[in-house]
A protein has these predicted regions:
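An N-terminal, well-structured beta->alpha segment
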Residues: 1-61, 65-66
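Short coil-to-helix leader/linker segments, especially the first N-terminal amphipathic alpha-helix
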Residues: 9-17, 110-120
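A generic local structural motif
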Residues: 21-24, 79-81, 120-125
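Short coil/turn connectors at secondary-structure junctions
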Residues: 30-32, 88-92, 104, 128-134
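N-terminal small/polar loop signature for handling phosphorylated ligands or for N-terminal nucleophile
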Residues: 47-118
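Short, acidic/small-residue loops that bind anionic groups at enzyme active sites
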Residues: 114-139
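Conserved small/polar residues in nucleotide/adenosyl-binding loops
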Residues: 140-146
């Protein structure tokens, strides 16, 4: 497949090595301090994490990390990341991984702008404000039978 860009209003960048341009994209949206969420250490072992973090630094974006997001993420991990985001003064959350990382990023982004317990959102409290959310690399793959 050929590289392409799509925006409606969500921007999608697709193509080889696009993860190495995350700093550029996030800088365009005004990100300055980002909490990076990821699942397993494979993200680091593959070099993907460092590629993304390096590009963020090259664009003047500070970052901290919270790894270990599991499938069917726990509220305790979300609360941990919310506390980190608040202490750091994050203005955005960057998800590297699959659906569980992205789901966690959404809860963290809302929780970081809320004075109560993030669990309140799951009980029906409406979200009034949230940090910016970026999904760097989706690890959700599709396998077709041959």
């Amino acid at each position: 497949m050929y590289p392409f860009s799509f925006q409606n209003p969500t921007r999608i960048e697709f193509g080889l090595d696009k993860e190495k341009e995350m700093g550029k994209y996030m800088h365009e949206y005004g990100a300055k301090k980002v909490l990076i969420i990821y699942g397993s250490e494979r993200v680091k072992q593959s070099g993907l994490f460092e590629d993304v973090a390096k590009n963020l630094r090259e664009h003047g974006i500070e970052n901290i990390e919270c790894g270990g997001v599991k499938s069917n993420p726990t509220i305790s991990k979300v609360r941990e990341a919310v506390a980190m985001a608040k202490a750091f003064g994050a203005d955005s959350v960057l998800s590297i991984g699959g659906g569980s990382c992205l789901d966690s990023a959404k809860a963290i982004a809302a929780g970081a702008c809320y004075n109560g317990d993030t669990w309140d959102f799951f009980k029906g409290t409406p979200v009034q404000k949230a940090l910016m959310i970026f999904d760097a690399v989706s690890y959700t793959h599709l396998t077709l039978p041959t």
